[in-house]
Amino acid sequence: MSANDILDVLNIQRDESNQPPKKKQKSSSTPTLPDGKQLTGMARELYNLVGPNTPPINLNSNSYTANKEKMKKFKPSPWTRMPFTPKQGIELNHWVKGSKELIEQQEFEEDGTPKPYFFEKYNVQLEIPEFVDEDTYDLYMIEIKEYESKMKEERARREKERKEREKRDLEEKKKKQQQQQQKSQQNPQNQIKDDEKNQDTRNNTDKKDSEQKSEDKPTVEAKKETDEKKDDVVLKDNTNETKPVTETTKSETETTEQNNSEKTNENETNKTNDKDGEGNLTKSKDSATEDQSNNKKENDEDTESEWTYKETKHLFELCQAFELKWPIIHDRFPNPNRTAEDLKEQFYRICIKILENQKNKNQALIDSLKAYCKPRELERKQYLENLLKRTPAEIAEEESLVIEARRFEIAAKKMLMERSNLLTLLDSPQTTQNVSQYQSSQGITNLYNNLLIYDKHQKKKQMANKSNPQQEPVPPPIPLAASSSVKRDRGFQTQLQQYLSSFLKQNHHTNPAVKQEINSIQQLLMKRLTQKEEEAYGLYFHGTEKLNPGVMLRSQQKLPGLNQRQSILKSVNILLQEMDIPTGGGTSWKPIMPTRKTMAKYDELIRSVVTLLDVKKAKDKLESEIKLIKSQRGL
């Protein structure tokens, strides 16, 4: 027995405060399922978060009984099947909420007139002009025919003008062809005459050469001379006999050539005439076929335009019934010869006339109806059919052509950009003086002479300066752009002058020319330079500034303002980019023109940017602290 059991038997109560604490049963750290399996991993974490996801065993049985009582108290509303007639000759039924007597009472208004159908507001119809009687229709058709006849006359006039232009062009072409043929016929005759002249000149030159040779020969022996004379006589006789033969043969050949050329030209002219005749025949045939087709079209239009009163009335009824849905109207129209375009044209023509004769006519609507053109609509449909009937190869070819066109456009744009850039680079500075006087040879010679005279004067001045060393040397003139308002310390200038004067005294030369140069330098150093002269000569006194030994470019100089951390330099670079100030990046930042003034200003700018960033950082920190304190205090 335990101590508690003994105390219960003896009816002795124990103070709970003095009792030792009960030992708690140790629960396993890992949860277990009812099957005894332990949960691990993700399932264990979900179990610890959600707990055992088991539905309660006890069901509330009162909910069903409460709902049942509510259902008993609820009374269903009555629904009645009522007839209605949306159109004449049709009677339909639908369910309406409420009793029959109440609905019948609500169907009539206080005056006793029946109320309109509730869903009648959704029955929207197009506003089509009312069709006119037969007399007005006939008047409208007469006006339409007169207007169309005028339009046809204008078209015929334009076609005639076009044909006349074509005929004129053909006649001009024929005249040009005939002129070319005549020129081609004249050219061979001129060539023959030129050949004859060339041959005559050649023969004359040959005769002269032979005579000169015969005169130049020495007469040594009389026998030889006599023999030669005899031979010459014989040769002359032979030549005289042969000349007419050759001339006759030449004339015969020339006549045959002329006859052949004339025959060929006649054949060519006959061929061209035959071709022209064939072309004229084909053109006349084409024109005849065109005239026949135009006449057929006109006859078709005349037959199509003959609309009766009954047909148009039926057309308006169909348009009103089917709300201008033209495929359905064309399908329901009794005349199969009428196309959808014919129906549209007739409907729009009559509507235009009706609207024009109204008192309050809408001009914008009339203009929109007049914009319809039947031949244009037929062409549009034909183009659309051709587009839809394209093969895949044709589509791919068109796409490739579009891509090539775009490439050409891009290449043209690039070329224009490059051309403009080159023009800007090659653009020469505009001269203030007139250059036309130096374009001629006389102007160039004058310019050359002037330059020579100027050079001589300069040499004379130099010789005079050397001969007069006692004159005070004059420094070169200072440009206006070199002036500035910056003040500098003048103590360094005096120190420099003292140092150079002592240096020149130590290095004393015996050469008189060197002495003259030293004297001029001493005089320049003894003279006190002004601020403008210092800027013009580029003199600068560093003072307490430390300089590295050796030669150094100013563009390679490291600015003292750049001795910052890398993060600060990045933020400085971002800010300079926002201000559109060019930088080289990294630690070698420098302006485009690194002069002394620009480098100094650039260093000041970087230092001011660094201080500005520090101030901004401190400001942001203070603002965040203020917001935090306000949120803590609930302000």
UniProtKB/Swiss-Prot annotation:
GO biological process: chromatin remodeling; DNA repair; negative regulation of transcription by RNA polymerase II
GO CC list: NuA4 histone acetyltransferase complex; Swr1 complex
Annotated SANT domain residues: 303-353
Region: Disordered, residue numbers: 1-38, 148-305, 458-486
GO molecular function: transcription corepressor activity
Domain of life of the native organism: Eukaryota
Pfam family, one: DMAP1
InterPro entries named in the record: DAMP1_SANT-like, DMAP1, Homeodomain-like_sf, SANT/Myb, Swc4/Dmap1
Locations listed in the record: Nucleus
Compositionally biased tracts (Basic and acidic residues): 148-174, 192-240, 263-299
UniProt-listed SUPFAM superfamilies: Homeodomain-like (SSF46689)
Entry keyword set: Activator, Chromatin regulator, DNA damage, DNA repair, Nucleus, Transcription, Transcription regulation
Subunit structure and binding partners: Component of the SWR1 chromatin-remodeling complex and of the NuA4 histone acetyltransferase complex.
Entry similarity comment: Belongs to the SWC4 family.
Function: Component of the SWR1 complex which mediates the ATP-dependent exchange of histone H2A for the H2A variant HZT1 leading to transcriptional regulation of selected genes by chromatin remodeling. Component of the NuA4 histone acetyltransferase complex which is involved in transcriptional activation of selected genes principally by acetylation of nucleosomal histone H4 and H2A. The NuA4 complex is also involved in DNA repair.
Designated name of the protein: SWR1-complex protein 4
